[in-house]
Amino acid sequence: MKLLKTYLKPFAALVLACILLLFGQAMCDLTLPNLMSDIVNTGIQLGGVDEAAPAVLNQQAVDLLTLFMNDAEAGTFKNAYTPVEHGSDEETKLAKTYENIKDMDAVALSEDADVQAVGDAYGKAAYAFMTFLKDYGAQTGQAVDTESGVQDMDMRQLYAVIPMLQQMPKETFSEAINSAENAQSMIGSQVGATFTKLFYKELGVDLDAKQMHYIVIKGLEMLGIALLGVLAAVLVGFFASRISSGVAKQMRSDVFRKVESFSNTEFDKFSTASLITRTTNDVTQVQMLISMGLRLMCYAPIMGVGGIIFALQKSVSLSWIIALAVIVLLGLVVVLLNVAMPKFKSLQRLTDRLNLVSRENLSGMLVVRAFTNEKFEEARFDKANEDLTRTNRFTQRVMSITMPIMMLIMNLVTLLIMWVGGHAIAESTMQVGDMMAYIQYTMQIIMSFLMIAMIFIMVPRAMVSADRVQEVLTTELSIKEPENPVTLGNESGELRFDDVSFRYGNAEEDTLSHISFTAKPGQTTAFIGATGAGKSTLINLIPRFYDVTGGAVYLNGKDIRTLSQKELRDNIGYVPQKAMLFSGTIDSNIKYGKEDADVNEVLAALDCAQATEFVSELPNGVESSIAQGGSNVSGGQKQRLAIARALVKKAPVYIFDDSFSALDFKTDAKLRRALTKYTENAVVLIVAQRVSTIMNAEQIIVLDEGKIVGKGTHKELLKTCPEYREIAESQLSKEELA
């Protein structure tokens, strides 16, 4: 997590923007079921009547309703309405909506009225009146259908009985009023809306137009909010992609730069296949985690918590269904995590293994064919492939079974809500629109848990990848830059080994012991010895591919550890034991040693390296293409181009690590003669297996088991060094030895 925080810090503003947009998107998604509920409850069932109390009433309606209110409510209700005078501007304005207002004494709801209190009183009175009608009809044998009959009532007949009702004792209505007091406010508001439609119909209101207007307005609100939600989702996706790709780019760049600073010690710790996987696949996993995490990690909790809050606002009585669903989903997520997480953690290790086997097989294809071991390599690859496939198959099956289980839970919860909600609707304790919204909120809660499950499944693999990337980035370099590097200077000085010893990291014994010699400018110092004597190891200490564990190496009298690595290596022309070319052209490969080299310098280096002949025969000369790794040129040609690349630097020190082994004797001799002139002012170090390559060197150092056993010229060593003479006798004729 520390790694992610570090890389997300530059994108803090975008991350904050994503979180805010996710809140906005969640609020849009949570608002839509509410609007759908309003359309069903108010727009369809109540005909678009959404007023808590009618805006305009017939005075007779006020007289009728106040009979079914207590004194306090009646006072509040009457004070809330003011008479509309005939012929007034107010009446003219209201007549546009209430066409019959001029034919009756009307009252209008005051702007400063307490709408909530008036609405409560109105709803209770409407419910009490309906209860009274029902009870009165039962007593007189003239039953009133309160479900549909109320909507067809003739208000003039109701107003006609007002005087009779006013003569009745107040106690006559007390039972109906008490029933209304005890009833849920939702029932009162529903009955109130039914009576509002009657009063509006009496006033000449176009109820169909009112209903259509309400539905259209709510529909447009839904459309607008849906578009806002889509816009927020698009912006979140854009920002999340920008953040994740930016983090991945920086992380990949940092890993690459870190690997470039590795010495051979670090490369011994990390395999090439592993470093490739960490730079590509592991970074991609982290990128996916950031991209999906920004969208799901923040969105899922907001939706889950918001869905629960909005659902409880619709109905508390159904909350046990949500609790049951959440418990089942939590159990499912826990089971999935315990089953899938260990497998996800092993995926990256198995990917590493497959890459390693693939790389070894491809790079060693000729050897595999030479020993007819194709079947063995196929078996190795099949095992690595099968292990990865089996683990991938298991994790994919776990993930694929998650969705059907979630859908089953979702459908069962929907059925349960419809069953329980249906009974609540029948008992008038819940509205159809509220049940529909409740189902939507429950689906959103379940989908939130599905997203959380996906996150928990994705996080372990991504965190393993992040740890693997961090392992590379936090690897302590064995070769460090000096805090205050000194400058080497322009003079071509000598190279000196002063009692140098070297031991590989976990080795028990030194590979090199007490090595001391001086290589002077204008002279060739050669190294020879049996295989494993430490020749290449010694050479690798000069450009600081490894650091000495004892003694010191000096260049121009300065300890190379006090020089910056760039300055040190800029002063060395290095030809490795295994020639390596890069994809491009011959010219680009030669200029790899010196980017600003002109044509004459390139041609001079090629001429000295004895590469001019075969380069000139190519159709495009120095612009001829080189395949990856130099696979389209021979071993000798590749080695000569590698030598030319080092020579073009015109460095004060040249290192040839067994760089003439692929050359024939004739080319070897010509190259050495040309090299003597080309490097006349430089320190030349040659590691060789052939005595003929180094017999003219001013100084030959013989190594055996990491120690110097002989030092001198060819003739001197033949007399004084048995090890050198043994090597020489195995390669040279008696005449040459003489």
Describe the residue ranges of each PLM region.
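Short intracellular "coupling" helices and adjacent cytoplasmic loop segments at the cytosolic face
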Residues: I44-E51, N58-L65, D154-M155, Y159-I162, ...
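Membrane-integrated ABC transporters
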Residues: M1-L32, M36-L223, L228, A232, ...
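Hydrophobic alpha-helical transmembrane bundles that constitute the permease/transmembrane domains
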Residues: F11, F23-T31, L223-V234, V286-L289, ...
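ABC-type nucleotide-binding domain
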Residues: V15, M69-A72, V84-G123, L488-A738
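Juxtamembrane helix-loop junctions of ABC transporter transmembrane domains
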Residues: C28-I44, V216, I225-T272, I276, ...
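An intracellular "coupling" helix at the cytosolic face of ABC transporter transmembrane type-1 domains
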Residues: P10, G141, L165, P169, ...
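Helix-loop-helix
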Residues: F310-I327, G331, L337-N338, F394-D467, ...
